[in-house]
Design a protein with these regions (language model features):
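Sequence-specific dsDNA recognition surfaces
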Residues: 1-9, 16-49, 71-72
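Amphipathic alpha-helical segments that form coiled-coils or helix-hairpins used
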Residues: 1-19, 27-28, 125-128, 154-169
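A short beta-sheet element
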Residues: 21-22, 41-98, 104-107, 115-116
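Amphipathic alpha-helical coiled-coil/heptad-repeat segments
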Residues: 84, 88-91, 95-99, 105-108, ...
Length: 169
């Protein structure tokens, strides 16, 4: 789970790191209106391109972050595994998302959220090692390409936004 980044503001002349909140996760990138946090936060709270991020409170969603390096705010999980590849846990999280949303909506009094116990109840089918290796040989390159294309698309959009005003004058 992320940090309450308002407690970790940049100090002095520190440039700061954009904060990844639900708004940024929805739009796929941080922008000039994104809050900043200190660069000295622990590494586990820093999100990089290709990290899987799950919003568990308010707006429930999961995405592969490709919006640049930023600090992970509270109400967001950085989803990782020491055993399984990114495509595997991303797709299983996405598979369960509709059910998580329904659970949060049923329990919502103000802002819906999902509890860890509900996440723990989510079942995942794990293939045998041979099948997993076969799936991985197909899925891993696809996910690497998706991430690469999304990063390139963001860079090209930024370049367009920078050059277009110059071309119009």
């Amino acid at each position: 789970n992320g940090l309450a980044m308002q407690k970790f503001r940049p100090q002095g002349h520190e440039i700061g790191l954009p904060v990844l909140k639900i708004k940024e996760l929805r739009q796929g990138s941080c922008d000039d209106s994104s809050e900043l946090c200190s660069l000295s936060i622990k590494p586990e709270y820093i999100i990089h391109n290709g990290d899987v991020v799950f919003s568990w409170s308010g707006s429930l969603l999961v995405d592969i972050w490709c919006g640049g390096t930023c600090g992970l705010n509270q109400h967001l999980f950085k989803v990782t595994s020491d055993v399984y590849d990114k495509w595997f846990y991303y797709l299983w999280t996405a598979h369960h998302l509709a059910r998580f949303i329904a659970i949060a909506a049923d329990k919502a009094t103000t802002m819906g959220h999902i509890k860890r116990e509900e996440l723990a109840k989510a079942e995942v089918l794990i293939p045998c090692e041979e099948d997993y290796t076969s799936f991985n040989s197909i899925m891993q390159p696809i996910f690497e390409l998706i991430i690469s294309n999304r990063i390139e698309s963001r860079k090209l959009a930024a370049l367009r936004d920078e050059l277009l005003p110059k071309l119009m004058t």
